[in-house]
Amino acid sequence: MYAIIKTGGKQVKVEAGQEIYVEKLNADVDSTVEFGEVLILGGDDVKVGAPLVEGAKVVATVIKHARAKKITVFKMKAKKNYRRKQGHRQPYTKVRIEKIEA
């Protein structure tokens, strides 16, 4: 059984036992989080929400909080000596999907 959930402005396909990276959640490590915005439930029969599947949720456990690798944003204007360099590290949360409830 799989589900497509909405978290952090993105849609993610998940299955039980899978470990995924999502945008940073306000939850402690080893705590349980519930994703209530389930768009599609798949398996033997597929349930498509309009826009959400009623009564469905995905339960997950927070494994760790971390930050992604640094990216460099560089702006410049040719021949004008205009240069701007900025770095960014996006925070994320790693979670393990425990169960999908329909």
Curated annotation (Swiss-Prot):
Transmembrane segments: none annotated. PROSITE patterns: RIBOSOMAL_L21. It comes from the Bacteria. Keywords: Ribonucleoprotein, Ribosomal protein, RNA-binding, rRNA-binding. One of its GO terms (cellular component) is ribonucleoprotein complex. InterPro entries: bL21-like, bL21-like_sf, Ribosomal_bL21, Ribosomal_bL21_CS. One of its GO terms (biological process) is translation. PANTHER family: 50S RIBOSOMAL PROTEIN L21 (PTHR21349), LARGE RIBOSOMAL SUBUNIT PROTEIN BL21M (PTHR21349:SF0). Part of the 50S ribosomal subunit. Contacts protein L20. HAMAP family: Ribosomal_bL21. Belongs to the bacterial ribosomal protein bL21 family. This protein binds to 23S rRNA in the presence of protein L20. This is Large ribosomal subunit protein bL21. It comes from Exiguobacterium sibiricum (strain DSM 17290 / CCUG 55495 / CIP 109462 / JCM 13490 / 255-15). The gene is rplU.
